[in-house]
Amino acid sequence: MALLDFFLSRKKNTANIAKERLQIIVAERRRGDAEPHYLPQLRKDILEVICKYVQIDPEMVSVQLEQRDGDISILELNVTLPETEESKS
């Protein structure tokens, strides 16, 4: 019976490992598909508008799109503005 238990338990572990791997693959694909094709152009356009008013480094602008509950999309924009001459004194 120990031999039979060995083979049966091994199949169970293999199935669990395969299931976990598939869950990881599905999660990675969902995360990769979450970014729409227009996001890089949107970031560029936002950067151009900000540069009309404030001179900043392009790396100081971060645009991220987050999906929640399937129906909700959150666009997060972070801009680090340089210090002004008035605030330095």
Swiss-Prot record:
Q: Is-annotated flag, keyword Ribosomal protein?
A: no
UniProtKB keywords: Cell cycle, Cell division
Q: Which GO terms describe its biological process?
A: cell division; regulation of division septum assembly
Q: Which HAMAP family match?
A: MinE
* Role summary: Prevents the cell division inhibition by proteins MinC and MinD at internal division sites while permitting inhibition at polar sites. This ensures cell division at the proper site by restricting the formation of a division septum at the midpoint of the long axis of the cell.
Q: Which family does it belong to?
A: Belongs to the MinE family.
Q: State what protein this is by name.
A: Cell division topological specificity factor
Q: State the organism named in the record.
A: Klebsiella pneumoniae subsp. pneumoniae (strain ATCC 700721 / MGH 78578)
